[in-house]
A protein has these predicted regions:
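Short, flexible loop segments at the rims of nucleotide/cofactor-binding pockets, characterized by
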Residues: 15, 41-43, 81-85
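Conserved hydrolase catalytic core segment
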Residues: 102-141
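Conserved acidic catalytic loop of the alpha/beta-hydrolase fold
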Residues: 86-104
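Catalytic nucleophile-loop/oxyanion-hole region of alpha/beta-hydrolase
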Residues: 77-89, 141-144
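Conserved HGGG/HGGXW glycine-rich cap/lid loop of the alpha/beta-hydrolase fold
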Residues: 18-76, 96
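Short, glycine/acidic-rich beta->alpha junctions
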Residues: 8, 87, 110-111
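N-terminal cap/lid segment of alpha/beta-hydrolase-fold proteins
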Residues: 2-28
Length: 144
């Protein structure tokens, strides 16, 4: 059985503006000099939770959580305007650039696994590795 790491607090919280009117909530915890790992939550419409930080060893990883457009602490909440898959992939890349990360590990669950795979297809040179759980590929047979 998987044992999660102890609860930790973020050392950084911020909002970054993407396509208007959207602003993404981003937090970082763990080791600022560690291996960067981006946690992509499920949904659409979900959000991150404090327990999402506990998947990673905080001594080894720079843990990055964000709330997707319209989700969690990102604003505006539940807004569908300019909230589509292509924009979400662009948002992930904007986060990487904003945080000045050369390459990172992508961790996605459910809808987050779909976004992680799509991001890795578009930017394979920027991805050190993929960790996927509860994989959802958004195919007809997955939906029906």
């Amino acid at each position: 059985m998987f044992k999660q790491f102890p609860a930790i607090r973020p050392y950084s919280k911020q909002f970054i503006a993407v396509t208007a009117p959207h602003k993404l909530y981003i937090e970082e915890s763990g080791n600022p000099d560690g291996i960067p790992v981006l946690f992509i939550h499920g949904g659409p419409g979900g959000g991150t939770a404090t327990s999402d930080r506990c998947f990673f060893d905080p001594e080894k990883y720079r843990i990055i959580l964000f709330d997707q457009r319209g989700s969690g602490l990102s604003t505006p909440h539940a807004r569908l305007e300019d909230n589509n898959t292509a924009a979400l992939i662009d948002d992930i890349e904007t986060i990487r650039q904003t945080l000045d990360i050369e390459r990172w590990v992508i961790f996605g669950g459910s809808w987050g696994s779909t976004l992680g795979l799509l991001y890795a297809q578009r930017y394979p040179e920027l991805v050190m590795g993929l960790i996927l759980r509860g994989i959802f590929l958004c195919r007809d047979e997955d939906i029906n």
